[in-house]
Structures are given as structure tokens and as C-alpha cells.
């Protein structure tokens, strides 16, 4: 398939044409300590490796090493049931005037039963925040909520959560006046 377009002085790259191409992104492996109820942890990417104010999209991966509710007493002793854990993900930023802002992006959690690791990546776009405010610096706050079930005399819970990584991406905002552009995709299997 060949797609052509005549160049002009104000052209920008057709977003649909390059939709399958990744943006510029950097990922930081976190490997956080266990998130404790009501004790937020803050995460960011070093500004030395990435121009943070240019960030358009952020992903954060949260995991659990297992989720279960084990009955310790009674006729059902030893039964393994599902449990849950709840947490919030907030986007915090400082504007050019030094004013701190906070916006809750997710109020969510995990529910179920799993004996091994389970991870989920949450992503959110901050381009509208950038359009409404200036962003000089930012961080992500994750808080395990006190509404999460806790172990008791009759039930032993496993519902610890951790932050595995964060990723910041810059969407391509390309301008090439009077220029033709070509994109290609090569299947990785061709390089076996």
C-alpha cells in the first residue's frame, strides 16, 4: 500500500497514518515496598532522563504477589476464598508558579483469588491538564485504602500490593514542512 500526500508549509503528520508507531517513552522499574493502608507512596521519573513537562501519557503498573482469604477456624477451616484490595492513583503536579495540584485518576482495586503474581497497568492522558495548567514537575501518588479487608482471628488475608513500574510517554507532534514522509513496519519474526 502506498499513501501519498503533497507537502505544504503548514502540514503536520497525519495521526491516523502513524497510529501504529510508538511514542517516545521512558520506563522506570520501581519495585516498591508493600503499600500500607492509608500511607501513600509517591513515584516519579528522574527529570535527568526525561523532560517531564513534555509528558503526555503516564502508565503505572501495580501488582499483588497473591490474593486469598484463608479460613482459620470452624467447619470451613482451610478454605481459600477470594478477597479484595482497594487503592487510589493520583496525579500530582507543580505549576510554573510553584503551586501544588492533585487530581485523582483512579479509585479502583483488585478482587479475586490468585496464588501467584497478578499485575495490571493503569494509564491516563494528561494533555488536557497541560492545556488547562502549566506543569513544571509531577509525581504519581498511590494509596492503599483502609476499606481494604484485613486479617482477623478467623481469616488470614493475602492482599499486599506493590508498584512495579511507571512509564511516561510523549506523543509525537511532528511537523515537516514541504516534506514527504514514509513509514514502514517489519514483522519481528522476520529476524529470527
Where are the regions that the model predicts?
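Polar, S/T/G-rich
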Residues: 1-192
Amino acid at each position: 500500500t502506498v499513501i501519498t500526500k503533497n507537502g505544504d508549509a503548514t502540514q503536520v503528520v497525519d495521526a491516523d497514518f502513524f497510529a501504529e508507531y510508538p511514542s517516545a517513552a521512558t520506563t522506570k522499574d520501581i519495585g516498591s515496598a508493600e503499600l500500607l493502608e492509608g500511607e501513600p507512596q509517591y513515584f516519579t521519573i528522574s527529570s535527568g532522563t526525561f523532560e517531564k513537562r513534555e509528558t503526555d501519557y503516564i502508565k503505572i503498573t501495580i501488582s499483588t504477589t497473591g490474593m486469598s482469604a484463608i479460613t482459620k477456624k470452624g467447619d470451613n477451616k482451610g478454605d481459600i476464598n477470594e478477597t479484595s484490595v482497594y487503592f487510589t492513583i493520583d496525579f500530582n503536579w507543580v505549576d510554573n508558579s510553584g503551586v501544588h495540584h492533585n487530581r485523582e485518576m483512579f479509585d479502583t482495586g483488585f478482587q479475586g483469588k490468585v496464588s501467584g503474581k497478578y499485575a495490571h497497568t493503569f494509564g491516563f492522558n494528561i494533555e488536557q491538564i497541560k492545556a488547562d495548567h502549566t506543569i513544571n514537575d509531577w509525581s504519581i501518588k498511590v494509596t492503599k485504602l483502609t476499606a481494604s479487608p484485613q486479617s482477623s482471628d478467623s481469616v488470614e488475608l493475602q492482599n499486599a500490593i506493590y508498584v512495579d513500574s511507571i512509564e511516561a510517554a510523549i506523543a509525537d507532534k511532528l511537523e515537516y514542512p514541504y516534506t514527504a514522509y514514509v513509514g514502514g513496519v517489519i514483522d519481528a519474526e522476520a529476524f529470527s
